[in-house]
């Protein structure tokens, strides 16, 4: 599944894998763009898989004219060895019935590569929040049992709110309670599979609506940064904080190209 850029596979033992879920507003993917661009992470390989819709494009993190012609595909892996971070970026949607096989293959690779833990950046439909969620922060987290043992004290010190359980079938009053992440894509599948395989995984998500989701992505990376300290906090002013993240060059066309002058 994983194909390295070099002749041999990189040593990822003890690394933290950051990855997005293809979810509402593409918030996780936008957040990953910010992380990869800000940390100037190097591409170390890609996933060769039939589970994602094929796509190809220019280098989304181009900084010069020279590297702007490099190609990118639907699932690429980047790393920053100095921080023991590896990042998977997903750029297309899943082919029908292929999301679960992808999750299984991905987690098998996580185990075989020796990654210490996985952090999934995701989102969920804001309109499906319950009354309690409407009155509190839009951010939530989930930890697998094996992850709780190692980071529970740190998470508690951050005063974060864990994702609440809700009725499995909202329309039925006496249905059982379970974790539901509407609009979360593969988030729930990844979480459930990681629980059963005893993989250390954390899910960080934000309740959002479709639209211009750049502010949501900035909020999500700051939420992650509270824990991992990817960037050292400089100020309590959120505008100063947000400006520290490097916007990738590909975001210039996030909403399409400009209007052609011929129209006028």
Swiss-Prot record:
It is found in: Nucleus. Widely expressed with highest levels in lung, brain and colon. Moderately expressed in muscle, stomach, spleen and heart. Weakly expressed in small intestine, pancreas and liver. Highly expressed in hepatocellular carcinomas with low levels in surrounding liver tissue. Changing residue 225 to K: In PRAAS4; uncertain significance. GO terms for molecular function: molecular adaptor activity. Keywords: Chaperone, Nucleus, Phosphoprotein. GO terms for cellular component: cytosol; nucleus; protein folding chaperone complex. The modification Phosphothreonine is found at residue 137. The keyword Phosphoprotein applies. One of its GO terms (biological process) is mitotic spindle assembly checkpoint signaling. Degraded by the proteasome upon completion of 20S proteasome maturation. InterPro entries: Proteasome_assmbl_chaperone_2, Proteasome_assmbl_chp_2_euk, PSMG2_sf. Forms a heterodimer with PSMG1. The PSMG1-PSMG2 heterodimer interacts directly with the PSMA5 and PSMA7 proteasome alpha subunits. It is linked to Proteasome-associated autoinflammatory syndrome 4: An autosomal recessive, autoinflammatory disorder characterized by panniculitis and erythematous skin lesions apparent in early infancy. Additional features include hepatosplenomegaly, lymphadenopathy, autoimmune hemolytic anemia, fever, generalized lipodystrophy, myositis, joint contractures, and mild motor and speech delay. Chaperone protein which promotes assembly of the 20S proteasome as part of a heterodimer with PSMG1. The PSMG1-PSMG2 heterodimer binds to the PSMA5 and PSMA7 proteasome subunits, promotes assembly of the proteasome alpha subunits into the heteroheptameric alpha ring and prevents alpha ring dimerization. Belongs to the PSMG2 family. This is Proteasome assembly chaperone 2. It comes from Homo sapiens.
């Amino acid at each position: 599944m994983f194909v390295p850029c070099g002749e041999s596979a990189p040593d990822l033992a003890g690394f933290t894998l950051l990855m997005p879920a293809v979810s509402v507003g593409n918030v996780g993917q936008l957040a990953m763009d910010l992380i990869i661009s800000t940390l100037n992470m190097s591409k170390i390989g890609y996933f060769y898989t039939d589970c994602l819709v094929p796509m190809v494009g220019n280098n989304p993190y181009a900084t010069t004219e020279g590297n702007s012609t490099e190609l990118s595909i639907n699932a690429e892996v980047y790393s920053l060895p100095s921080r023991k971070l590896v990042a998977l970026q997903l750029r297309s949607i899943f082919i029908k019935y292929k999301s679960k096989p992808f999750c299984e293959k991905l987690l098998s690779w996580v185990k075989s590569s020796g990654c210490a833990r996985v952090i999934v950046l995701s989102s969920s439909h804001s309109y499906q929040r319950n009354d309690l969620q409407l009155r509190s922060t839009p951010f939530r987290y989930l930890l697998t049992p094996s992850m709780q043992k190692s980071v529970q004290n740190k998470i508690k010190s951050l005063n974060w709110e864990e994702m609440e359980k809700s009725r499995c079938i909202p329309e039925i009053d006496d249905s059982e309670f379970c974790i539901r992440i509407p609009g979360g894509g593969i988030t729930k599948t990844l979480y459930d599979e990681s629980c059963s395989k005893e993989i250390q995984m954390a899910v960080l998500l934000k309740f959002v609506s479709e639209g211009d989701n750049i502010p949501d992505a900035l909020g999500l990376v700051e939420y992650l940064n509270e824990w991992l300290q990817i960037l050292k906090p400089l100020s309590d002013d959120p505008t100063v904080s947000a400006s520290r993240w490097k916007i990738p060059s590909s975001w210039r066309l996030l909403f399409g190209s400009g209007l052609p002058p011929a129209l006028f």
